[in-house]
A protein has these predicted regions:
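Alpha-helical transmembrane segments of multi-pass small-molecule/ion transporters
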Residues: 2-203
Length: 203
């Protein structure tokens, strides 16, 4: 949110067709691919739900970084990240409820919707507003430079905490999780590229 500017929203008006195709692909390819892998690999309910949840989440900043490193269309990637994030309070609970209904884990859409608003949309909105109001402030610009590092450190702490608290279970299923995530990401890249190719995008 702190790096989001009004310029990032211009692509939505300039390339609405591409953005629509990207949003549709985001919430069709990754969720249904995750669902297919849970069935193909016969994953336990807990791991299956986790993979489906990942598949139903919006594209994050990492997609923008990968686009940059691979020489892709970074502006389009940022636009897609923005749209998929704005759609996530509705699409993520909806898709998870639909695809994870076969597990023995209770899925509650409304609490998930509220949680996404609180943890994703609200912080992004506050960051965008601060950037809009204070973007030219020297101190704020210095803060912007260090925030990505702080965010990565915070994420590492969260992941480390989860892994350490579930260490035995994680290592018991480590190979299965690795294979599932590798296939999900690899096939997601291929299918996403194919969707762009089929719709005439510059690939």
């Amino acid at each position: 949110g702190l790096t989001l500017t009004t310029e990032d929203f211009k692509i939505l008006a300039q390339r609405p067709f591409d953005i629509c195709i990207g949003a549709i692909a985001q919430y069709l390819i990754m969720p249904f691919l995750a669902f297919a892998l849970t069935k193909a690999l016969n994953l336990p309910d807990g791991i299956a739900l986790g993979l489906i949840l990942v598949g139903c989440c919006p594209g994050g900043v990492s997609s923008n970084i990968m686009s940059y490193l691979c020489g892709g269309d970074v502006a389009f990637s940022v636009g897609m990240t923005t749209v998929s994030t704005l759609l996530s309070p509705v699409m993520t609970p909806l898709m998870v409820s639909l695809l994870a209904s076969g597990t023995h884990i209770s899925i509650k859409g409304l609490p998930m919707f509220v949680s996404i608003i609180e943890t994703v949309i609200f912080p992004v909105a506050v960051g965008f507003l601060l950037n809009y109001l204070l973007g030219k402030n020297k101190t704020f610009k210095e803060l912007q430079k260090i925030m990505p590092g702080i965010a990565v450190l915070g994420l590492a702490c969260v992941v480390g905490g989860v892994v350490s608290s579930q260490g035995s279970k994680f290592f018991e299923s480590g190979v299965v999780i690795f294979v599932a995530v590798f296939l999900h990401n690899g096939l997601g890249y291929l299918l996403g590229y194919g969707a762009g190719k089929l719709t005439g995008m510059n690939t």
